[in-house]
Amino acid sequence: MMKYFYALFLAVILPFFAVAQQVITYSVSPVSFDESEAITVTFNVNETAFGTASSHALYLWAWSIDSATVLQDCPTNGTWTASNPVNKLTYVSSSGGIGTYTYTMNTVKSFYGNRSNPLSKIAMLVKTINGSVQSQDILMNVGKFQFNLTNPVEGSTNVVTSGTVINITGTSTLPANFVVKANGTPVYTSSAATTTLNYPYSVTQDAAMEVVATNAADGTVVTKSFTVALSIPVQSAAIPSYMKQGISYDSADPTKVGLAIYAPSKAYVHVIGSFNNWAVSANYLMKRDTTNPDLYWLEITGLTPQQIYTFQYRTADGIKVADPYSTLVLSPYDDPYINQNANVYPNLPAYPTGQNFEVSVIQTAKPAYNWNVTNFAKPAKENLIVYELLVRDFTTQKTWQSLIDKISYLKSLKINAVELMPVMEFDGNNSWGYNTGFHYALDKAYGTPEKFKEFIDVCHQNGIAVILDIALNHATGRSPIERMWMVDPNGDGFGDPAANNPYFNQIAKHSYSVFNDFNHSSAATKYYVNRVLEQWIKEYKVDGFRWDLTKGFTQACAAGDDACTNQYQQDRVNILKGYADYQWSYDPSSYIIFEHLGTDSEEAQWANYKIGEGKGVMMWDKQTNPYNQNTMGYDTGSNFNRVKYSAHGFSERRAVSYGESHDEERLMYKNLTSGVSVAGYNVKDLATSLERQKAYAAVFLTVPGPKMIWQFAELGFDKSIYTCENGTVNTETDSTPGDCKLDPKPSAFGLNYDTNAARKSLYDTWAKILEIRLSSDVFNTKTFTVESGNLMPRLFIFNNTTSSALKNVVVLANFTSSTQNIVPDFPYTGSWYNLMDNTQSNVTSTTTPITIEPGGFRIFGNSKALATNEANQSKNAVSLVLTQNPVSNGTASIRYTNAKNGSLAIYDFSGTLIKTVQVSKDNGDENISINGLKTGMYFIQLKSEKGIAVAKMIVK
């Protein structure tokens, strides 16, 4: 994969699919050049491998590094999925399947954008127009005078015994004077200008070596460096008890830190960092744990409390990596751009000069965040209303602070959970977040860890849970646990996983692979995932995870085998159950949501897992197409009956249904571009389409069970998911190569959608529907019916376990293009109320049709909906509900609120006290043992400081 391309991310993001890489040969004329000169690069390409044997359409993707080591894209690249024609290579000829192509730059400086600093290096690769196939990275030095160190390898660490002679050799393009230095002291000076260096150096000490080549004609200097170190035995010692893999702080001693890394097949590991001037030294050679020899550890002492230090591990084979369990990572590729336009990350530590690759940050005695909410009562899984958002596109400021400033907007919508697209350290700063390199660290692009904690804290103060989307199916090539065991054909420090990599498959074991595929059967991978889950739950108090691409958690299939990947796989079932247990071990009430979109039989294995304990995994339930068919006005494919959990074979409400997600086209966009249009009624009209989105909410949000909304659906967001930054639309299937799916999208706030009257009316309607849904116990039921498929859907919801008078709800909608008389089939006659405004109707016949305008809806209840103040009073009252009734298997699952200092008492039907139980929290779920109770009816009484609640229990 493209290392420096990941580093830039200035204009584009790599689409999340595998990119085929082909090795090509090349030459440049002249061989050495200044930035003011013209050059011609010749490429020899296997045209069959690139798929261009007939089209000969290949393009240059280029970037440069200036004298300040700042990277920048070539201005004529275009986007990764749609190359600029300016960068098209000139086809010369073909022979034996190998095509010869050239590209001429009039001047190197102008081609790379006339950068203000002199160019140090230029880089390029050859690609197809849509980026599906690419060459390796090609890197060239700029300047007529060049010096190449041929031995040892530049930047290498050479561990040898004392007295070993190393031949230091190199060549220059022009006559030069050479000086070799050890720890800054010259040990060799050439007697005359020459183009070759050959000096035998006897190693007697650890030394930082420099070879300085000075152009005899003009004094231009080129310096190359490497390190020599005397070998010493690796000490074996038991790792201290306070340490584990990663960075461990000793609460009793803020002047030291423990570092430990799992490094099988590595002969030794050094720690290099700001505390030892980044030098390889015997004093920083890590020890082997006596119990686990593959675990290396070292204590760093003499640190100043609260001072920031940076470090890397350097393995015996010269690979430098940050700690995979870093909580803060500094990047030479991404960090220069974080605070360019705003102070997104105040006091961002500077990347250490002279280093390369990511580095870890350590800081002892760092002040802890003072949480306002320490024991958040999560909304019940069955009542979750999840708001999925991408920080990058939600506000114009794209920061945690800007999200904090919008809490009132979210709270007023009545949602009770936000689901953030991945915020773990990803490559670049402009991304959906699924290109994760460091799963343990928070990405810096949106702000500091403290500000992220504040966002979570504020959400909890407002009754909103926080769920993180997490991509544990894969990791990018920047990941330390990928780079430590890699095949590096270019010697640039990046490459694909090697056969001995303990974490990754060399070839993916499923057909949806992106980046590097984790081997989830590996004990090393399982430990890594376990630690990642623990970090986010304990450190940030997140309420759960949405697991991305769970179809990839198998070892049973081949990379291109769709059929196998989509079938039931027992190893995948077992692996993910194991991970669920890990997550629940840290927080038994933690939400687990899988994006699987697989067979019902496999999904039911997780949805029904430990359901008797009130657990069970929630499964993404895509209902985009049927709901969109309704909103557009087409009856074909409009049946959304699978919005019901039981249609999937789940025993409880564990289907997180959605009409929109980050991955699906926006309903409003399709309404406006493809909606039905007939005389007198046009779905493509904005006002008409916005009204239909109200009806969509009525037959979507009222269905019992968890639901998910994609950001700004409540405002009728109508920009295509394929909208480009310039406002055009480029899809995966249109004639323009590539697509703009991953491009940044405008914020609805920036478009003033939130102040537009028609859109605000839609928002208010959604908020009202959600208020009815969440304040009425009638919706906390498993007894409901969904009828759809004819553009006049009907929902029938019933709950006789609630103490509220509202026990029946009937929802009707008309998605046709004309007024319809819809038979309500009320369950009984009498007074029925439109819950949107509590207007009363006297129903004398349950089958008398209700006249509903096109795009309209009605939500009827047998009793009034609670007014807001009544709902608030209800929320402050004691409540007690059995989540499963009748009860069996010796356990009663209950849910209660306002139970501070409360106790439960179970009575039989005659009023005899059977047992008492002290509740463990103020609000939440609890399981009570009823072993020994005979079949029959009982009462459970909850008594607390706020009052008393009673529920009827039937034991089978």
What are these regions (language model features)?
Residues 150, 783, 787-789, 862-883, ...:
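Residue-level detector of functionally pivotal "anchor" positions at catalytic/ligand-binding pockets or at interdomain
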Residues 16, 871-956:
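C-terminal outer-membrane/trafficking sorting elements
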Residues 844-867, 936:
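C-terminal beta-strand-rich structural cap/linker in extracellular carbohydrate-active enzymes
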Residues 21-34, 141-161, 873-884:
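Short, compositionally biased P/S/T/A/G/V-rich stretches that sit at domain boundaries
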Residues 57-113, 188, 250-253, 258-306, ...:
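Aromatic-rich carbohydrate-binding modules that target alpha-glucans
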Residues 541, 574-718, 722, 774, ...:
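Conserved alpha/beta catalytic core and glycan-binding cleft of carbohydrate-active enzymes
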Residues 228-269, 322-383:
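Basic K/R-rich, polyanion-interacting modules in nucleoproteins and related proteins
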Residues 330-331, 336, 367-544, 549-568, ...:
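Substrate-binding/active-site clefts of carbohydrate-active enzymes
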